[in-house]
């Protein structure tokens, strides 16, 4: 049984760990940063710091949730409310973003910020009133156990519906994730290829319609 609750600042380190391991060699991050590191340990440490800053910068204006099993956080998600402003450079600086400059350099950080905006541009343009799924991460040791689907169906979708949201969008960059989101009721509406540091990365945009009276499994599961 997974219990869901809104994350607090004390949870950010654990969420960063989950995110770093879930997205450690995700094409979206690999193409931007991996070549700046000499070994996997230093790259993984940097990824954890990057995700911690991202969570801190976005959680102030948006909602971050965790799934808890036997007292341990095993899944996490960050969703952005279209009525709230997106985190900007100032928000990232306040969240400790300057600590990300070494060893990759400031220009690479700023370039990644713009790269991220471009990656989600189709979602913002075609579905400007939609909620946006920024992060969905699960414990690697429990992948395949339904944690990601549970977070979507039992926590995020009921929450967005309760807030009056009618759409939820996201992007992904792997074939495996494409299948996962289709299985969970999302529809792909855009496909592009992004280029970064000589690498080509597939970028797929998805949207789910959330009717006002959509029947979900976990309407009362969020604490």
Roles of regions detected by a PLM:
Residues 45-66, 132:
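A short helix-loop-beta-strand connector motif used in the catalytic cores of GNAT acetyltransferases and
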Residues 61-77:
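Conserved beta-hairpin
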């Amino acid at each position: 049984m997974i219990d869901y609750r809104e994350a607090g600042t004390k949870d950010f380190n654990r969420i960063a760990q989950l995110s770093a391991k879930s997205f450690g060699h995700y094409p979206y991050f690999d193409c931007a940063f991996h070549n700046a590191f000499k070994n996997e340990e230093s790259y993984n440490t940097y990824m954890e710091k990057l995700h911690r800053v991202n969570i801190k910068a976005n959680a102030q204006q948006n909602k971050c949730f965790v799934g808890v099993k036997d007292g341990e956080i095993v899944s996490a998600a960050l969703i952005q409310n279209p009525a709230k402003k997106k985190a900007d450079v100032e928000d990232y600086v306040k969240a400790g973003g300057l600590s990300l400059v070494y060893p990759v350099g400031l220009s690479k950080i700023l370039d990644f910020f713009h790269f991220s905006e471009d990656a989600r541009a189709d979602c913002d343009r075609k579905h400007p009133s939609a909620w946006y799924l920024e992060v969905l991460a699960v414990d690697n040791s429990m992948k395949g156990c339904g944690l990601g689907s549970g977070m979507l169906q039992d926590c995020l979708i009921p929450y967005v519906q309760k807030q009056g949201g009618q759409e939820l969008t996201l992007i992904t960059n792997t074939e495996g994730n494409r299948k996962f989101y289709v299985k969970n009721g999302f529809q792909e509406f855009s496909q592009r290829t992004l280029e970064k540091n000589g690498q080509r990365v597939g970028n797929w945009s998805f949207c789910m319609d959330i009717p006002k009276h959509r029947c979900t499994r976990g309407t009362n599961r969020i604490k």
